Amino acid sequence: MKELEKTYNPAEIEDRLYDKWLKGKYFHAEVNRSKKPFTIVMPPPNITGQLHMGHALDNTMQDILIRYKRMQGYEALWQPGTDHAAIATEVKVINKLKEEGISKADLGREGFLKECWKWREEYGTRIVKQLHKLGSSADWDRERFTMDEGCSDAVLEVFIKLYEKGYIYKGSRIVNWCPVCKTSISDAEVEHVEQDGFFWHINYPVVGEPGRFVEIATTRPETLLGDTAVAVNPDDDRYKDIVGKMLELPLTNRQIPVIADEYVDKEFGTGCVKITPAHDPNDFEVGKRHNLEEIVILNDDATINVPGPYFGMDRYEARKVMVADLDKMGLLVKIVPHSHNVGTHDRCKTTVEPMVKQQWFVKMDEMAKPAIEALKSGQLKFVPESFGKTYLHWLENIRDWCISRQLWWGHRIPAYYCQDCGDVVVAKEAPTVCPKCGKNHFKQDEDTLDTWFSSALWPFSTLGWPNKTEDLDYFYPTDVLVTGYDIIFFWVIRMVFSGIEQTGKCPFNTVLIHGLVRDSQGRKMSKSLGNGIDPLEVIDKYGADALRMTLITGNAPGNDMRFYWERVENSRNFANKVWNASRFIMMNIEKAADVSGVTEKDLTLADKWILSKVNALTKDVTENLDKYELGIALQKVYDFIWEEFCDWYIEMVKPRLYNEADETKAAAIWTLKNVLIQALKLLHPFMPFITEEIFCNLQEEEDTIMLSNWPVYKEEWAFEAEHEATETIKEAVRAIRNVRTSMNVPPSKKATVYVVSEDDAVLKIFENSRSFFASLGYAGEVILQKDKAGIGEDAVSAVIHKAVIYMPFAELVDIEKEVQRLKTEEKRLEGELKRSHAMLGNEKFVSKAPQAKIDEEKAKLEKYTQMMAQVKERLAQLEK
């Protein structure tokens, strides 16, 4: 047995242990038909990413579950990997090239992609190394990348299958367009930011009725150039007579109709809505219903493309000039300040432009149905259950999914256009002959696929699909997905419908949802607020175990949590407590004789009590982990180690350890070692480093704690009678300590303790525990009796269950010194009361001071009055 260092130094042990785990391949999982599999797929972090608190929480939760199941004997696979992060990586590479004076266009597609791969080689593994620092026990031998050969093959396979089935099509629809990145982006990449803007109220003249206008209100007056109708509610009596009439569209030479559509809320605004089908998703739907023209007014860089005075202007410049022109024409009614949510690109913060574009889409109506049924039938469940409603809401209101992106980095769409006849061929490789015209001039589609398209296949593409591999057969479907509530729609739903469509099985049976890690004020961590906390900084200062414990303690599924540095310090203090207790136990084991012969009959009341406690803890923690109550499980382990084991049991057995003649010393050491081993195992999934270091030093024959058996509940360790008996002793000790604290008696001052009870069984409990009871209760002598005979009237008492504890007053307190101390305190309080009364009686103070200051002084007066009453009462008792 190696002796532990005097102080716990995480920086010294964590990297060393992680290297040992990697070399030992302890994280590796293989197909093993004699064992039950347990699989988690890691949500692949972006290769552009750096570890943040969200990653730290997400991966700590996954690691806890994997370590737990591994110890339970499952073949536990935690499948890791990274995401190519199309737009994020492309932006990073463009910026890097810009610094070198090179543009994306200069390099061309192939040259630019080479730069992207170089960037990935240089920076793509950074976040993986950071996950190592956290202690993540993922099977790094199996690490995948969304653009590796296998995953790319899966993407092509799915695209072609869905296209052939008629689920993938190319068409014009409204997309989120970023004018800076010049690509469509997913809803997931649109960040809605509240901005102060305006409602511009504009009059549209009614054709043929001079002086009659229809008033509309818009937050984007420049889109007027793309209006193809004005809509009113069919039940709105104000406008029934003009439905079907034409309006002059200001600033253009066009006329547009007034149409009736139930989309319009007649109670909102003027009850008239301008319809711009090419630049608003709701207007697009109205346009489809009424067969309206779709006029795209913007170029890809958000400059105006409509011939006329505004041609070539930026959208905001055009807005300014158009509003001024409307005002000159007398058509600008008013401008009303208006705060509203504006969609911005989360990468570059540019305002996103809804725009009709030719894009590739996935039809969602049919694919959504089995994903809905999976939840309703119980194949899939959410923890907490309430998030199932969010999942259903998204699926029941789902729109076709725009999967094309105007980027170069990513999976290129496998569509080839015949340059002679225009036919489209979708295939894994460029066709040699056009099936329609027989020519061989093809050009591949320039667009790439949405990043979510490949990550939707992650649970099965990482296991070898579309090939029928042993890994896929054994490890799929996976067991649990751990993720944040913010990507239920963007990732979870897409994995479910993709998994069912391609494999016939739901890709996981449970989705464990966690919330966000917020700052101490409850704000979301962000660069703009400057309130982000780097997990690596926490690890460097306090160790990975302290960070993991902080993130999990008190954390309930689905709820946001606040990060406090004080909690990290508490976690570090707990690690120190575990270390110091283990070191103390190991030092005593070293000095002891062989304890292998200890049997149950050698165990004392206290030994059986702590065994019953760790036994009950084992049952509770196992149940909590099975229900994904990670925070509750950790809190129970913490309470047991800190309170029951360290503060009580170790203190109970110290008299036995320090007494060479004590016949029960071997039993104490045997119990200490066994309980410590069991507690370390229960703590291991949460705090892997410190538990590994202690466990392997305590038992040099063991290679690692992570492959040891998870503790199981033992009926023979229930020890109910001994448990109840020891709880009685603890109750008595607490009562004694409370009395002594109230009387300011230091632990060094011993006093006789009388235990009075008519119950022989109670007296026997104290008889059997006399030595540690005396030690914990600071007793010079323990006297057990059935009545109060011989106990002075001045004795201080405390009532416990079936007994009364007495302590002679004179043994606790030096009466003369205590009277002197109380008189000094009385004098001090008289001064404070006089000062407080004077302040509150001063009219000037009461009339001019802030109310908070007056309330503070009133509270002081109340406190001093109570303290004075207690001092006087105590003096009266002593002077008797």
Language-model segments: residues:
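Non-catalytic terminal extensions that flank enzyme cores
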Residues: 1-53, 76, 333, 346, ...
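Feature 926 captures the class I aminoacyl-tRNA synthetase adenylation module centered on the KMSKS loop
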Residues: 201, 393-453, 457, 501-544, ...
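Residue patterns forming the tRNA-binding/recognition surfaces of aminoacyl-tRNA synthetases
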Residues: 2, 16, 20-24, 94-213, ...
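Secondary-structure transition/capping motifs at alpha-helix termini
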Residues: 67-75, 96-109, 129, 133-138, ...
